């Protein structure tokens, strides 16, 4: 059964499995499964084949049991296959290498026959695992519904035996091996297959938090938690260190399932808990030997805070790639307007900014004689009109509003709103593109909500430059400035989703995405800034910048799949709005981050900076971005001349 109820969480991380250490021969598997399920485990990680088996001509695979001992739903829902651990496809012994290849293919074929959802592959036995990866890659090309989880120890381990001799002669060589490197090498050899995932062995010691953080951008499906990783509390029960608890919470938040593995190291006498045999099946009333460990895992899960309401709303958008809006080329639909209008935080910030501007514009002595002219450019269905009039009421200032909107469908709704609220004497509706309209008078305040996830990516600079002629020389623009930011990320899922399109164009497109399964590798840095009113209205809005990101040394090596983009806007003075992680406006959902992918992920060795170049390019009919990495290795210039992705003027 699930570890517990956590409001809003429907992910697979609610389910906990147990590793079967001994081969359940003959008809034992149903009893082992029944005992585990009755003890509140949800599935087994179980060997499918006798570990003593070696292939011989004409031999029959000594499987754990006939496929008939469990029903199809039980095989699919409650069994994860464990491939024989003796398999060594990079052994120097040729016979062992050949036997390993035959057995691996036989076991995967049997798992496919059983309709298992996943099989766990044994960890690489040495740093060089090219033949292992080659055989697995062959197998992956023939699989449809079966995932292969490569087992990787989550530790900074000593060098493998074959590497010791070389280390003696190289004083610069590190005395530790980063197990992430094993995974990365294997994944690259297998061409980033979306069906190749990771099962992390969590031991008693852990690398640094920065090093651990890399794994949240990788396709980790399970954390195999060893019983020797547990400590003992004052009452004799198993517990985890603070660092292990934090890691476990991170796994739960990233939909990673926990599998408990090992022998019981705690003699907990509670309801007949056994102290030794985790496969005991004789008395179903007796709790599983590893139940105390499961109880503790459930305790960690249940004490997590419920998912915030905003996260629950956004959960179905996690890591889902969307094309950015084209508000100039396209007219937004009613549903899109409605979604944005529900973002009360955004309009509260706008109202605060407008109120401050009104107070600065009109002194208390002049409130009865001065009427402020305010233009909302891109009025949509009227939320900024409402915010402006509420700010005027709040500050006691008189206001004359022009609502300029190019979408004729939105104008219909805008007319209805004005009539319903009785604002006919206060608001003049202009059905026109702001770049074409000739205003009858100059504005004191120009208000717009033309910002995209990257700040300028929905052409706010071009629109506001065109509307700036409406503004008095000392007029106020809200927003007054905005800055874009980027950071390098590991995002294996996003990369594989784009790769599935099998073309270059999708790798040269920027996507709006609710980032979830990612690893943030370095702090954000600013890219482009635009100010309004524009002090040089005739200057080009083209931009170019070069940035260098330093990845913390303790992180180790990493793989960069692309760059996450954000913005921060100054609406007026100290009132800001944005999604840049360090300064993000809380509880605002109008914008997800933007993602700029790389056609080929960039491997970044430890202690090596990343150098990236970004261009904002402008043509007669479109605006587009180009981007490229030049260090530690050069990438192609993405989206050259806007060939794959652009925003139409």
UniProtKB/Swiss-Prot annotation:
Q: What is its main location?
A: cytoplasm
Highest taxon of the source? Eukaryota
The name on file for this protein is Protein arginine N-methyltransferase 5
Q: Where are the annotated segments for TIM barrel?
A: 10-300
Keywords tagged on the record: Cytoplasm, Methyltransferase, S-adenosyl-L-methionine, Transferase
Where is it localised?
Answer: Cytoplasm
The molecular function terms of the Gene Ontology recorded here are: histone arginine N-methyltransferase activity; protein-arginine omega-N symmetric methyltransferase activity
Encoding gene (name) = PRMT5
What residues does the SAM-dependent MTase PRMT-type domain cover? 321-627
Q: Does the keyword Transferase apply?
A: yes
Tell me what reaction this enzyme catalyses: L-arginyl-[protein] + 2 S-adenosyl-L-methionine = N(omega),N(omega)'-dimethyl-L-arginyl-[protein] + 2 S-adenosyl-L-homocysteine + 2 H(+)
Magnesium as a keyword? no
Q: Where does a protein bind?
A: 340, 449, 458
What's one GO BP annotation on this UniProt entry?
methylation
* Region listing for Beta barrel, in residue ranges: 479-649
Chain residues that bind S-adenosyl-L-methionine: 337, 346-347, 405, 433-434
Q: Where is this region: Dimerization?
A: 491-507
Q: Which SUPFAM superfamilies match?
A: S-adenosyl-L-methionine-dependent methyltransferases (SSF53335)
Chain positions of site Critical for specifying symmetric addition of methyl groups:
340
* Cellular component GO terms, alphabetical: cytosol; nucleus
Q: What class of enzyme is it?
A: transferase
The catalytic activity of this protein is classed by the Enzyme Commission as 2.1.1.320
The task this protein performs is described as:
Methylates arginine residues in proteins such as histone H4.
Q: Which residues form the active site?
A: 449, 458
Q: What protein family is recorded?
A: Belongs to the class I-like SAM-binding methyltransferase superfamily. Protein arginine N-methyltransferase family.
């Amino acid at each position: 059964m699930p570890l517990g109820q956590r409001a809003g969480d429907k992910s697979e991380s609610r389910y906990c499995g147990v590793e079967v250490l001994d081969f359940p021969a003959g008809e034992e598997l149903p009893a082992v499964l029944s005992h585990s399920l009755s003890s509140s485990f949800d599935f087994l990680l179980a060997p499918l084949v006798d570990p003593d088996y070696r292939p011989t001509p004409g031999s029959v695979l000594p499987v754990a049991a006939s496929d008939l001992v469990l029903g199809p739903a039980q095989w699919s829902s409650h069994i994860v296959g464990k491939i024989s651990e003796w398999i060594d496809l990079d052994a120097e012994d040729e016979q062992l290498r050949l036997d390993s290849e035959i057995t691996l293919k036989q076991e995967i074929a049997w798992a496919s026959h059983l309709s298992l959802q996943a099989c766990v592959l044994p960890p690489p036995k040495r740093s060089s695992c090219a033949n292992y990866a080659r055989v697995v890659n062959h197998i992956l090309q023939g699989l449809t519904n079966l995932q292969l989880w490569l087992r990787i120890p989550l530790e900074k381990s000593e060098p493998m035996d074959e590497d010791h001799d070389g280390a003696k002669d190289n004083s610069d060589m590190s005395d530790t091996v980063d197990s992430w490197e094993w995974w990365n090498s294997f994944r690259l050899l297998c061409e980033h297959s979306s069906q190749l995932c990771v099962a992390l062995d969590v031991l008693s010691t852990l690398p640094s938090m920065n090093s651990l953080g890399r794994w949240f951008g990788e396709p980790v499906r399970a954390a195999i938690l060893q019983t020797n990783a547990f400590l003992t509390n004052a009452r004799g029960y198993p517990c985890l260190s603070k660092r292990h608890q934090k890691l476990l919470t991170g796994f739960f938040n990233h939909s990673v399932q926990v599998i408990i593995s090992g022998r019981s190291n705690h003699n907990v006498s509670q309801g007949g808990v056994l102290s030794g045999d985790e496969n005991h099946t004789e008395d179903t009333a007796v709790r599983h030997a590893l139940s105390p460990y499961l109880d503790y895992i459930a305790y960690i899960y249940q004490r997590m805070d419920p998912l915030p309401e905003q996260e629950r709303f956004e959960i179905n958008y996690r890591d889902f790639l969307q094309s950015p809006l084209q508000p100039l080329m396209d007219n937004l639909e009613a549903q899109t307007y409605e979604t944005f209008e529900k973002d009360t935080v955004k309009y509260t910030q706008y109202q605060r900014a407008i109120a401050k501007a009104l107070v600065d514009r009109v002194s208390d002595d002049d409130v009865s004689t001065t009427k402020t002219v305010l233009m909302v450019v891109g009025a949509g269905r009227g939320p900024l009109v409402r915010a402006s009039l509420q700010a005027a009421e709040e500050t006691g200032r008189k206001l004359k509003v022009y609502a300029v909107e190019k979408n004729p469908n939105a104008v219909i709704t805008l007319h209805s709103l004005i009539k319903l609220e009785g604002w006919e004497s206060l608001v003049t509706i202009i059905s026109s593109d702001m770049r074409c309209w000739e205003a009858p008078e100059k504005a004191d305040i120009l208000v717009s909500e033309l910002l995209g996830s990257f700040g300028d990516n929905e052409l706010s600079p071009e629109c506001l430059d065109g509307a700036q002629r409406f503004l008095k020389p000392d007029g106020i623009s809200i927003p007054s400035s905005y800055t874009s930011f980027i950071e390098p990320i590991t995002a294996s899922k996003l990369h594989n989703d784009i790769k599935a399109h099998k073309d270059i164009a999708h790798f040269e497109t920027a996507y709006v995405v609710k980032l979830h399964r990612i690893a943030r590798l370095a702090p954000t840095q600013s890219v482009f800034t635009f100010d309004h009113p524009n002090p040089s209205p005739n200057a080009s809005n083209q931009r170019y910048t070069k940035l260098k990101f330093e990845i913390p040394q303790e992180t180790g090596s990493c793989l960069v799949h692309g760059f996450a983009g954000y913005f921060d806007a100054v609406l007026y003075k100290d009132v800001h709005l944005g999604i840049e992680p360090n300064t993000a406006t809380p509880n605002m959902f109008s914008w997800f981050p933007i993602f700029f992918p790389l056609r080929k992920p960039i491997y970044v060795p430890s202690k090596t900076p990343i150098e990236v170049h970004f261009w904002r390019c402008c043509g007669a009919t479109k605006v587009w971005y180009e981007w490229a990495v030049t260090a530690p290795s050069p990438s192609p210039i993405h989206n050259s001349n806007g060939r794959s992705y652009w925003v139409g003027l």
